[in-house]
Amino acid sequence: TKSQQPAAVVNSIDLNASYSSVKWRSIGPLRGGRSVTASGVVGDISTYYMGTTGGGVWKTDDMGNTWRNISDGYFTTGSVGAIAVSESEPNTVYVGMGEHAVRGVMTHHGDGVYKSTDAGKTWKKLGLEQTQHISRIVIHPRDPNIVYVAAQGALYGKTPERGVYKSVDGGTTWKKVLYVDDKSGCVELSMDYNNPQVLYAAMNEYGRLPWKVISGGSGSGLYKSNDAGATWEKIQNGLPKELGKMAVAVSRSNSEKVYALVESDSDKEQGGLFVSENAGKNWTRVNDDHR
């Protein structure tokens, strides 16, 4: 019989060569300062929202060719920390105020959460004014009324208004579902969109003093909930003992795979990119660059 021919081998693409002629260019907007948050719209490749640290929320409908401010006249401060667009109802947009990237020079703190149900044409304030700096907003993929807010809290002092807040009525009322102490806020929140009952929250003891920036302490840690925020378990097997700011993301294609970018004691070189292959039970460092 005729021997079977081997399958064709697809040559790998040299991405550097493919994009060597592409040049970066600014697409604006030219007012507002730094940006620490942006969000697209599922199913719409042309529409994006961007939050700036001094100029409020901006929107593009044409892939970034033009931008327009959509928060002027509604917001009482221009410092935006988080934007989230509902996957099941794209006209529903939540915005958390107060930039979350702690640095030597910070803009004004935020004043809570705003919501739009008409894709940014109008806005309503939903409370949580004392959280001051919001780092992430997560919306249930099938119910826009279930929403979680990661609140870092005040930068310059101790306050209890920090942690993870949850609403089941579209932001009309809020319940604090994760709290560590009055110095530690939630810097990152990630949901398993294949099972929205599962959440990961990164808590960080942080603050700003006249002579230094604080990031990391006894209140820092990575937490997981399997019951939509009702209870939480601290997970740390394989992670550095000393934790600072963290970023966390659950793989959409595999809920068992979770990534964590961890700041740790830089002198000991313990930080970096960690991955879990069993939904947070164990962690392995795969890269020592934590930038």
Kindly give the residue locations of the regions a language model identified.
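Beta-propeller blade termini and top-face loops
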Residues: 2-291
